[in-house]
From Swiss-Prot:
Pathway: Amino-acid biosynthesis; L-histidine biosynthesis; L-histidine from 5-phospho-alpha-D-ribose 1-diphosphate: step 4/9. GO terms for molecular function: 1-(5-phosphoribosyl)-5-[(5-phosphoribosylamino)methylideneamino]imidazole-4-carboxamide isomerase activity. GO terms for cellular component: cytoplasm. InterPro entries: Aldolase_TIM (IPR013785), His_biosynth (IPR006062), HisA_bact_arch (IPR006063), Isoase_HisA-like (IPR044524), Isoase_HisA-like_bact (IPR023016), RibuloseP-bd_barrel (IPR011060). Its EC number is 5.3.1.16. The keyword Isomerase applies. It comes from Prochlorococcus marinus (strain NATL1A). Belongs to the HisA/HisF family. It is found in: Cytoplasm. Its main location: cytoplasm. The active site is at D8, D129. It catalyses: 1-(5-phospho-beta-D-ribosyl)-5-[(5-phospho-beta-D-ribosylamino)methylideneamino]imidazole-4-carboxamide = 5-[(5-phospho-1-deoxy-D-ribulos-1-ylimino)methylamino]-1-(5-phospho-beta-D-ribosyl)imidazole-4-carboxamide. This is 1-(5-phosphoribosyl)-5-[(5-phosphoribosylamino)methylideneamino] imidazole-4-carboxamide isomerase.
Length: 256
């Protein structure tokens, strides 16, 4: 299980939204390239990058910034936001993005997700962003008629890198993740699950570490890193030690 710091791009700046609301924007760093370097220096093994402009409009407004971030760090990047065509996906892979995250097209163009996952096995993730159990699309501005669990089941036939499960109601609130929703997704998904939304403390990370053996392989953290609620270096070490201790206890149990 890994902790993945998030950078959300809006007009070339590093920001966070509250519950996906574009009218509630907090700017944390006007230099997202520098921010990416900071997260790598603190031990991040992967970066979660979201093009909020792309998610809302479908247009690649932040491509220059994305390319600069890619050049400035050595860790792999997973990128989501406005990826709604094969050509766009190929553009991002060509500039060195490790994983793409598909959201809206998983609902609107499921065949496209299938085709991309075949052409790029284990390099396509699907973001299941849910509000009251129903999947939201178009930068969370529209509500679909499919539940998050039904979508997760439909994706079981695809060779995905991961499902990124976000509870919109908790995202950006620091009030803790929706553990029940995450467990339900992990239970029915063959693909690995990455948790996102609501992480506000080390205790929240520890609560999710208990489910590492149930298919939750990563935790995306955003606002809590920026406001100092969580120190990335400390969090990575804490989680590593906790998982090592769990593995030791499991091994010891069989030796008794």
């Amino acid at each position: 299980m890994e902790i993945i710091p998030a950078i959300d791009l809006l007009n070339g700046k590093c920001v966070r939204l509250n519950q996906g609301n574009y009218n509630e924007v907090t700017k944390f760093n006007s230099d997202p390239v520098k921010q990416a370097q900071i997260w790598e220096s603190k031990g991040a093994k992967r970066l979660h990058l979201v093009d909020l402009d792309g998610a809302k409009t479908g247009e690649p407004i932040n491509d220059l910034t994305i390319k600069e971030i890619k050049k400035s760090i050595t860790i792999p990047i997973q990128l989501g936001g406005g990826i709604r065509s094969i050509d766009r996906a190929k553009e991002l892979f060509d500039i060195g993005i490790d994983r793409i995250i598909l959201g809206t097209i998983a609902i609107e163009k499921p065949e496209l997700v299938k085709d991309l996952s075949k052409e790029y096995p284990k390099r396509v993730a699907v973001g299941i962003d849910a509000k009251e159990g129903m999947v939201a699309t178009r930068g969370w501005l529209k509500q679909s008629k499919i539940s998050s669990l039904d979508l997760a089941k439909q994706l079981n036939d695809l060779d995905l890198a991961a499902i990124i499960s976000t509870d919109i109601a908790t995202d950006g609130t620091l009030k803790g993740p929706n553990v029940q929703a995450l467990r339900e997704i992990a239970e029915i998904s063959i693909n690995p699950v990455i948790a996102s939304g609501g992480i506000g403390s080390i205790a929240d990370l520890i609560s999710l570490a208990d489910f590492a053996d149930e298919g939750i392989e990563g935790i995306i953290v955003g606002r809590a890193l920026y406001d100092g609620s969580i120190d990335l270096k400390e969090a990575i070490l804490t989680l590593k030690n906790l998982l090592l201790q769990d593995a030791f206890n499991e091994k010891d149990k069989f030796l008794v």
